[in-house]
From Swiss-Prot:
It is found in: Cytoplasm. The gene is tuf. It comes from the Bacteria. It comes from Brachyspira hyodysenteriae (Treponema hyodysenteriae). PANTHER family: ELONGATION FACTOR TU, MITOCHONDRIAL, ELONGATION FACTOR TU-RELATED. This is Elongation factor Tu. Belongs to the TRAFAC class translation factor GTPase superfamily. Classic translation factor GTPase family. EF-Tu/EF-1A subfamily. Residues 10-219 form the tr-type G domain.
Length: 410
């Protein structure tokens, strides 16, 4: 299964592409891997457009009965200073909620905007969602600049993007905006050009430099107890079951005992292998890894559970929380709600319906309010105090919360 060992000599950073459908997110993802693999052939593999697209499409066709279907593709690449894990998020409006999990894993995002089309509906939605889920750093790639008849159009679109970033709480004037053509960069690499000197590859080098300099080195909680939210589950013939996800804290290595917590009764097992991009690793906080589990059947584990050091986290259905309900201008509800309200609660990699009950003398919670609430989920999930979550309804985020007290252990 593994093809080598990841040495981890460079700082590891998680990024991803966001933006409107057909603006070139997947093409840019492929272009970055093409340029990076030409510069670092020993450690980076070029990922063709079709491979990135098919990964998203195949995941998008997963079981429709599941609570949350994620259509994303994971690739890796390097700059001179960093190792990047990159998630390519879908841009269709129907998949907008899928970005929550992808975006929640990002230390920064690459916003792709077509210079031909300018800012479009999903451009704004993805920027808003990035702000809501805590992605604090965005780098902009103005794509398809080779197709512009009038160079001034790029100036107009750039100003439009800055306005959108400012509107949603980012500093548009300080945000790096790189102009270029992802497809031209791919064609240059395919023609055997040197990426460090070819003019069509310069935009990708500039983008990598912007990622290196604008997104700060992430602070990882390596010294805490291991916890990884399960994003996907695979069965490998002759080997067993593999669960994948981003390590939230701590570290894991071959031979460690772990528990699978949430949704189902807690199970204890042993991790018999840890890999990242087909390389054996000691998994540490921030890494997207696959963990091979001993004696666990594929059907016995699912997305939304967590893998954790035994005894460090428990499943809960009922809890108290401090929440902020977004105002209409922030993309939230237009009206208030009362006890009995049943939105979706997004915790880590899953969403669960929860029944909200107001506390004290409160009769109604209005947009813009901070409130203490009691929430009961229909399914127990791994939960701990100070854990953050999003409240979603009708395809949009209507509130953000933090767990203040777990009431009942399942």
């Amino acid at each position: 299964m593994a093809k080598g060992t990841y040495e981890g000599n460079k700082t590891h950073v998680n990024v991803g592409t966001i933006g409107h459908v057909d603006h070139g997110k997947t093409t840019l993802t492929s272009a970055i891997t093409a340029v990076s693999s030409a510069m670092f052939p020993a450690t980076v593999q070029k990922v063709a457009y079709d491979s990135v697209a098919k990964a998203s499409e195949s995941q998008g066709r997963r079981d429709p009965t599941k609570i949350l279907t994620i259509a994303t593709s994971h690739v890796e690449y390097e700059s001179d200073n960093r190792h990047y894990a990159h998630v390519d998020c879908p841009g269709h409006a129907d998949y907008i909620k899928n970005m929550i999990t992808g975006a929640a894993q990002m230390d920064g995002a690459i916003l792709v905007v077509s210079a031909e089309d300018g800012v479009m509906p999903q451009t704004k939605e993805h920027v808003l969602l990035s702000r809501q889920v805590g992605v604090n750093y965005i780098v902009v790639f103005l794509n398809k600049c080779d197709k512009l008849d009038d160079p001034e159009m790029a100036e107009i679109v750039e100003a439009e993007v800055i306005d959108v970033l400012d509107h949603y709480g980012f500093d548009g004037s300080k945000t790096p905006i790189i102009r270029g053509s992802a497809i031209k960069a791919i064609q240059a690499i395919e023609a055997g050009k040197d990426p460090r000197t070819d003019p069509d590859c310069k935009c990708i080098l500039d983008l990598l430099n912007a990622l290196d300099t604008y997104i700060p080195d992430p602070v990882r909680e390596v010294d805490k107890d291991f916890l990884m939210s399960i994003e996907d589950v695979y069965s490998i013939p002759g080997r067993g079951t593999v669960v994948t996800g981003r390590i939230e804290r701590g570290k894991i290595e071959k031979g460690n005992e772990v528990e699978i917590v949430g949704i189902r009764p807690t199970q204890k097992t042993t991790c018999t292998g840890v890999e990242m991009f087909k390389k054996e690793v000691v998994g540490i906080a921030g890494y997207n890894v696959g963990c091979l589990l001993r004696g666990i059947e594929r059907k016995a584990v699912e997305r939304g559970q967590v893998l954790a050091k035994p005894g460090t986290i428990t499943p809960h259905k009922k809890f108290e929380a401090e929440v902020y309900i977004l105002k209409k201008e922030e993309g939230g509800r237009h009206s208030g709600f009362v006890s009995g309200y049943r939105p979706q609660m997004y915790f880590r990699t899953t969403d669960v319906t929860g029944v909200i009950n107001l506390q004290g003398d409160a009769q109604m919670i209005m947009p813009g309010d901070n409130a203490n609430l009691t929430i009961e989920l229909i399914t127990p999930i791994a939960m701990e105090e100070k854990q953050r979550f999003a409240i979603r309804e009708g395809g949009k985020t209507v509130g953000n919360g933090v767990v203040t007290k777990n009431i009942r252990i399942i």
